[in-house]
Design a protein with these regions (language model features):
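Carbohydrate-associated surface elements
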Residues: 225, 244-247
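Nucleotide-sugar-dependent
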Residues: 71, 75, 277, 324-329, ...
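Membrane-proximal helix-turn-helix segments that form the acceptor-binding/catalytic region
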Residues: 80, 152-154, 202-219
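Acidic anion/phosphate-binding donor-loop and adjacent secondary structure
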Residues: 197-203, 231-232, 248-263, 275, ...
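Nucleotide-activated donor-binding/catalytic signature segment of Leloir-type glycosyltransferases, i.e.
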Residues: 304-330
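Conserved donor-binding/catalytic core segment of Leloir-type glycosyltransferases
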Residues: 260-277, 282-286, 294-297, 412
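A charged, aromatic-enriched C-terminal amphipathic alpha-helix characteristic of glycosyltransferases
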Residues: 400-430
Length: 433
């Protein structure tokens, strides 16, 4: 009981501490995704029609209840929304921070805002009193009602007549169920990670995944290994499950040409650095080749030690960069890497970065992940640090234009628009959308 009250008190105090003390102390303290959002035009819901296009005839609106902030690292949910919008669907994307992104504390702020992101894509912001960390715990009844009411008000303001819910994290299960009860909105669970492999996911959120599996009209898995793992536990999923892998926005990377400046061999990585990153593989390669340069581009998580590359001056931690800047960084790479430890979390992943590397034609050295091994003729697989070094040496020496062309062909074929088309077709079979 006392522990629960302490948690309640901490949640009530945290928004004031963050916005009045922690964020103002340093510009670096405020998450970059919050700053990026504030650069877009936002309006109260009653003015929604000023920034949202009219619904397309015959096409349902797509409600994305995601695992990721739109303004953070570009991941599956953002790309699927872009795919849907490219097919004519309006997309509404819920910001998962539930008020923490607002510059003002709850009593002083707007409670609902709609942000215009791109043509046919808008982002809903709902401010909750406690601003709960969305992957730490289940939403309570009042919070579910507030989020649901915000979505319903948005749909009314934008004259939405048909919708489908694409749920990327089980914390939104109760919201999706309320929407289905009120509007007969089909529920898609887009399961793209083995959630139990993350340290920061609350146990009651993990418990909710079973409820979401049971209630979803369609379950989409992003990887074959992930699908097999869950269906082996819940055989009843087999009748409503489909594998739809990740993809690439190949046009975004189409102009990438290796910078020919005569500099050192450059080995690159794009993505988060956390507990699943194989530090020893990169250390071994950097130690063996001190004349090479290693560029690791992406945010570091709490599971990544600060001294991971102590003593290795040829390794640069670049930090998070905007999606628009990724092509310029990849143009510096001679070889791209996916150095992941082999564990259930990584075996369940279908790395977006693989398709993005392919879109640039880059040779890729990777741990033997199940989804990467499907392209064994186009990648260099390495099962331990010593082999990782050897495969990097092979990849650096690659001089086969046909392989670069083949990789680009894969990226063009495995695009986000086609993934969205497949999802719509699969949902139509089950829910009549």
């Amino acid at each position: 009981m006392l522990q629960g009250k302490a948690l309640d008190l901490k949640e009530l105090i945290r928004p004031y501490y963050l916005k009045w003390i922690y964020f103002p102390v340093s510009d670096n303290h405020c998450p970059p995704e919050f700053k990026r959002w504030r650069q877009y035009p936002s309006v109260p819901l009653e003015l929604a029609k000023q920034i949202v296009s009219s619904a397309s005839d015959g096409l349902p609106d797509a409600l994305f209840l995601p695992m990721t902030d739109w303004h953070g690292i570009r991941q599956r949910s953002q790309q699927m929304a872009r795919g849907f919008s490219g097919l004519g669907h309006r997309c509404f994307y819920l910001n998962p921070h539930l008020g923490r992104e607002f510059p003002q504390v709850y009593p002083l702020s707007q409670k609902r805002l709609l942000t215009s992101l791109e043509p046919r894509i808008a982002e809903l912001h709902v401010h909750l009193l406690r601003e709960p960390v969305f992957h730490h715990r289940r939403l309570n009844r009042e919070e579910v009602e507030t989020v649901t009411a915000g979505i319903l008000a948005m749909l009314q303001a934008t004259e939405s007549s048909r919708q489908l819910s694409i749920v990327g994290l089980p914390v939104w299960t109760d919201v999706a169920l309320r929407l289905r009860e009120a509007l007969h909105t089909p529920i898609v669970y887009d399961c793209h990670d083995l959630l139990e492999g993350f340290d920061g996911i609350g146990q009651d959120v993990l418990d909710q995944e079973g409820e979401l599996f049971a209630s979803a009209d369609l379950v989409v898995f992003s990887a074959e290994w992930l699908a097999h793992e869950h269906i082996s536990r819940r055989p009843e999923l087999a009748g409503k499950a489909v594998v739809i892998r990740n993809g690439a926005d190949s046009q975004h990377f189409a102009g990438v040409v290796r910078n020919s400046g005569g500099g050192p061999v450059t080995v690159g990585y794009i993505g988060a650095l956390n507990s699943w990153f194989d530090i020893q593989a990169i250390r071994a390669a950097a130690s063996e080749h001190p004349d090479w340069r290693f560029l690791l581009v992406g945010p570091t998580g709490s599971g990544f030690p600060k001294n991971a590359f102590a003593g290795l001056k040829n390794i640069q931690l670049i930090g998070e960069v905007g999606y628009q800047d990724l092509p310029a960084w990849m143009a510096r790479f001679d070889v791209a890497t996916i150095p992941f430890l082999i564990q259930p979390l990584t075996m369940a992943t279908n790395p977006v970065k693989l398709y993005e590397y392919f879109a640039c034609g880059l040779p890729v050295v990777s741990s033997p992940l199940a989804e990467v091994a499907r392209y064994s003729d186009l990648v260099y697989l390495a099962g331990d640090p010593a082999e990782f070094v050897r495969q990097l040496e092979r990849a650096v020496q690659e001089n086969d234009p046909s392989k670069r062309d083949a990789r680009r062909t894969v990226a063009i074929r495995e695009n986000w628009r086609s993934r969205s088309e497949t999802l719509i077709a699969e949902l139509a079979k089950i829910a009549g959308v």
